[in-house]
Amino acid sequence: MDAFKLLTRATKLKGGAAPSSAQSSTRLPSTGKAANPQLFRSSEADKVLEEARHGKKRKRVAGPEAAESDDDGAELNFFGSSKARRSSASMAKEQEKEQQEQQEHRDDTSDADDADEMDEVQCRTVLNAHKIKVTDMRDLEEIQTVRVESEEPKKKKKKRKQQEESTPALTKKEQKKARRVYPQPLVSFKELRTRYKISRRLAENIAEQGFSVPTEVQLGTLPLLLEGFKVSGNSKDAESIEPDLLVVAPTGSGKTLSFLIPVINKIVRHHHEQEEERGIFSVVVAPTKELASQIVNEGRKLVHGTGVKITLMKKGMRVVDREDDDDENSHSEDSEEGSESEQDEPSTTRKKKGKAPVTKSDILVTTPLLLVNALSANRTKPMATLPLVRNIVLDEADVLLDELFRDQTLDIWRACTHPELRASLWSATMGSNIEDLAKSTIKERKQAYDRTNSYPLLRLVVGLKDSAIPNIEHKLVYAATEQGKLLGLRQLLHPAAASASDVRLRPPFLIFTQTIPRAIALHSELRYDIPAEAGGSSRIAVLHSDLSDGQRSEIMKNFRKGEIWILVTTDLLARGVDFRGINGVVNYDIPNSAAVYVHRVGRTGRAGREGGIAVTYYTKEDIPYVKSIANIIDVSEKLRGKDGEKSIQKWLLDALPDLSKKDKKELKKHGVKARQSNLKSVKDDKEHRKTRISTKSGFDRRMENKKKALIAASRNRKSKTQSTDPGSDNESWDGLDG
C-alpha cells in the first residue's frame, strides 16, 4: 500500500502526473535503460516482426487455453465445502505445473520446426527498415556460378558455359544488386533457444541479463553466425555454411554480445561431441587492456554454468606447451648443478615459479603484444601455433589492422592453423583499406588450405558507414584560445543562468585530450573545481597508459561505481569501453581523425539511451582540421531527422578548409602540431606556450620556477659537500667531556 495515496485519498491531488512530465523532459543516459535499444525502426518492420512473434504464440497458447477453460468449471463450485475447494485448487495448480513443463518441452523440440521462415520480401522489409545492409564480398564470378549451379540442372551446364562468354559485363549498379544478401533476421532472443538450438544454460544466462529486444547488429549477425549462410539462396534445402564476417555497426549497439553468443555455443557443442579434446578454441583480440577485461567480464556472465572457461591474457601466462621450453629448463638445471649447497633451495623454488602451467581455457581474450610475446617467447623463438582455434575475433578491427598493431595481429592470425578457422572483424568504423587487407588475408588462407570455394565472406553494415550515432546531441564550440577552452569547460562544471543556447551537461562525463601531459595538466587545473561538500578532488581523476595496471583498474572501478564523476583521459578509453550511464563527452582537444571522433562520442548514448551530449572545443590552431568533424555531425543530424535549427550551418561547412591526404596522415599520426609534447625549435616552443593548460600568470610561473631552481641548487651544494668530506660520515659522537 502506498502511504502517500492512503493519506491523500480525500484530496484532489493527481499523483504521478507532474513527476512523469519532469522525468520525460530531463531524460538522460544515467537515468536508466532505454525501453528499446534499437536505433532504426519503422512501422512496417514492426508489423512483420509482430506477425512472426504472434504466429508462434498462437500455436503455443492454443493448448493451455483449452485446459484453463475446462478447469474454470471445476473451480466455480461456490456452495461446496472449503476442503473440496482447497483440493480442487491444489489439483488445478498441479495441472498448471504439468502443462508448463510440457509446454517448455514443446518449445525446445517442435516450435523451431513449426515456425515459418520469412520470405525474401519480408526479410528485405525488416533489414531495410533497420538500415542493415549485408553484402557478399566474394568475387562476382564465384557468386554467380554458385547461384546458377543451384538453380540450373546438370544438363544445361555446357550451354551456360557457352553463353557466359557472350554475356556483357555488369554495370556497377547491377554488381551491387548481385552482391546484396537478405538473410533471416532474429525476431527475439527467445528464438535463440527454440529455433537456433543454443545451449539451455546459455539461453538462461542471456535472459538473466535482461536482454529482450535484439539491436540491429544482433538482429543481423546472430542468425548468420548460429545457423550459417545459405550460399545458394534462402530455400529450405540449401546448405548453411558459417561465413567469415566483417561487421560495421554503431557504438554501443551490442557487438560484444553478438560475437560472444555464437562462440560460446560452438564450444559447448564441441564439448558434448568431443569431451576429451580441450584447449583454446577461440581467440578474441582487443587493442587495450580495459576493453579486453570488459569483454571477459561480459563473457563470464554468459558462460556461467556452461562448462566454458574464458580467460584474460596476462603477462607471464603460458598458452602453448613448447618443447623448446623443456630443453631450456634442462639446460639451466645442468648449468646450476655446481652451485653451492646454500643456494640449492632458492634455485629450486625459482625454477618452479619460472615455469607457469599452460592455460586451460576455451576462450582467450588478449591484447596483440601479450599473445605474440607468449607465442614467440618474447620474440626470441619462432611463433608457436594454436592448432585448436576455430574462431578468431578482432574487436576494433580497424585499429588492430592499422600500422601500430598490424604485424602483431597478422602474426596471431597466421598462428591459428586450423583449416576450419572462421574470422570475424568488428568495429564502428572500417576503411576500405582495412577491408581489402582482411579480404586478401582470408583469401590467402583459403588458397593455402585448398578451400577456395568452401565458405563466403560477408560484410554487414548498420546505418551509414563510419557515422556517429544519431541519438546524441552534438555541439561544436569555437573557443579561440586555450584559456577560452578552460573557461568553457568551467562553465560546464558550474553552469550560470540557463538560456536556450547554453550547453547543459551533468556528471558523469569524460574529457578527452590529445596527449598524456595535457591530460595530467588539465586534471591538476580542474582538481579543486568541485566543492568539498560534493566530494572535492576525489570526484575528478585522470587515466592514461603511463599508470600501472592496478591504478588503471582501480580508477575504472571507481568511475563505474559513481565515486568518480569526471574522468580526464586520452584516446585510451575512446574505443569499445562500455560506460552505460555516461551523460556526455567533452573533446577538450579535437580528435586526430573522423573515426576517432565517432568512437569518442560513442561512449555516451549506449544501447539506444537518449539525452547524451558531445561537446567539442576548437581554437584558432584547429580550424584547418575541423571540417571532417563538422561533416560527421551534419550527417548524424540528417540521420536523426532532427527538426529545427541545426548545430552545423551550411555557411560553416563551406567556410572550413579541406584537408589534404598528406595533412590527414600527419594529423592521424601526431595530432595538432601546436599540442605535440616533443617540440624542438624555438618557434614551436612559442606555439606550445600558447596551448599550455594553465590559468597562472607569467609572474607566478617565474616565481615558482625560481623557487624550484633554488631548491635544486641547495641540494646540489649539499651533495657536493658530502662527497668532499668522506670522513665526516664515519665520525662518531663520544658524548660530553667530563
UniProtKB/Swiss-Prot annotation:
Residues 20-29, 721-730 have a biased composition (Polar residues). It is found in: Nucleus, Nucleolus. One of its GO terms (cellular component) is cytosol. Residues 236-448 form the Helicase ATP-binding domain. GO terms for molecular function: ATP binding; ATP hydrolysis activity; RNA binding; RNA helicase activity. The keyword GTP-binding does not apply. InterPro entries: DDX52/Rok1_DEADc, DEAD/DEAH_box_helicase_dom, DEAD_box_RNA_helicase, Helicase_ATP-bd, Helicase_C-like, P-loop_NTPase. Residues 13-116, 148-179, 319-358, 664-738 are annotated as: Disordered. Keywords: ATP-binding, Helicase, Hydrolase, Nucleotide-binding, Nucleus, Ribosome biogenesis, RNA-binding, rRNA processing. A motif (Q motif) lies at residues 191-219. Belongs to the DEAD box helicase family. DDX52/ROK1 subfamily. ATP-dependent RNA helicase involved in 40S ribosomal subunit biogenesis. Required for the processing and cleavage of 35S pre-rRNA at sites A0, A1, and A2, leading to mature 18S rRNA. The Q motif is unique to and characteristic of the DEAD box family of RNA helicases and controls ATP binding and hydrolysis. This is ATP-dependent RNA helicase rok1. It comes from Neosartorya fischeri (strain ATCC 1020 / DSM 3700 / CBS 544.65 / FGSC A1164 / JCM 1740 / NRRL 181 / WB 181). The gene is rok1.
